[in-house]
């Protein structure tokens, strides 16, 4: 890897760490309490070797064993060990609390921010990758953060405390320990740089794998119908192999951390034992002091092993957190203007003035588009796939902003209207049905949670959904599984229609609204729609021209332009593009 990329990774890692510390800073009192408990835990832990050394000297240094003094020391050791256990338990509890609250804060922030992102981001990123960032990556981050809290505080304090005690016993031998121990730090630092890159690739590839799995599960019927299983398996195998490769390399580097540092620390321990034995023989220290010193040397080197493991886990945590912060840093939809108007008393006057729009800068989709819709008019938009029909709907709802020109409702540019008030004045039934996990009643009342039972049933009857609902096991209390898996496509669309029937806003958008309903049901729904559209401005997008014959005006689109405009009969008489589309559907019959 080039030095430039290394610097970028290092800067990204440091920036991510700083942001994590900002989140942790919200719980500073918990951190302070954890530090105090860590200090108590370390102090008590370091007190035990002193007592052990004194006990050894009581046995070795005198002709007769002082059993009374030895008993007092043993009671002190027992008390210190007991208090250490209690303080360590409290510290771990506080650390767990801080960790999971920080994780909750970041996950909530990521989810809330996700709902503010423009549809362009959602359309451009696989849903599986987004889910992986909010779920899997944050879980990985929490594991590393928890280990950091649990071991980092006590590790640093233990190193400082043991160093002071060793200096008080024998400065020269302490120098041996201090000189040799940094070798393990060098080893851990070298490995940490390698593991961060591998863990980052691992997280990114895990997101790819989640995205592919999510895509396959959501379209299993299509995959099987076209015999695409083998190709899907190849894609899965390729991504899975890359994930295994990154995981193995990350594990390889992380797995050699502890053995390497333990080897160095064992060398330190051996050096202390040899020099300490020589000091005892020469009378520079007692056997009890050597016992204490060996214990301190072990305690001094042990945190380096733990910290090296913590550093490895933190690299994984930082790599995962970086992906989450990338999502959080995505540019949100611009807030409504401070003086944005709330849309009220809507009659349904809509104007599109010289509108230009493109999803990508190099391909203009809508160009010089003009449309004037009077209140209560039913406007049908037809044309071949990709001509811009659904894009017009996206612009009307302000899911996307126009590149140039303007869209007005009641004479006001929709960019000067709050998004919420604009969208609540539209009722929308889309080709892609969406139902939340919950009861049928909850789904119908999605736009009006306060609706009464009578209103919900009336809306279902108007949408011709009441009959099949009553045949369900629990009627309106039947729980719909994920994405309506226990309903047919037609039933799901009828429920979406009932949802709009309940709200009855002044403007309607029907995008391929009856594409998944059988002909008999479609006739009933069309009658219900006709009643619903009376006095309401309605935009109907459909490929099946039989659904738009009664429209007040039909816009025929081609390559982002209106090429024809008029009523059904007028357009047929002209014999133009509309007549060509119509005849292609019905002439064969």
Q: What is the predicted role of each segment?
A:
Residues 2-10, 100, 108-132, 136-138, ...:
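Short intracellular "coupling" helices and adjacent cytoplasmic loop segments at the cytosolic face
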Residues 26, 30-43, 54, 80, ...:
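Transmembrane helices of ABC transporter permease
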Residues 1-45, 60-77, 91-95, 99, ...:
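Membrane-integrated ABC transporters
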Residues 228, 252, 269, 299-327:
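Cytosolic ends of transmembrane helices, especially the final helix of ABC transmembrane type-1 domains
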Residues 25, 36, 69, 75, ...:
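Hydrophobic alpha-helical transmembrane segments of ABC transporter permease domains
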Residues 329, 336-337, 343-589:
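ABC-type nucleotide-binding domain
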Residues 15-16, 24, 56, 91, ...:
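Juxtamembrane loop-to-helix connectors within ABC transporter transmembrane domains
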Residues 119-120, 136-145, 149, 157, ...:
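An intracellular "coupling" helix at the cytosolic face of ABC transporter transmembrane type-1 domains
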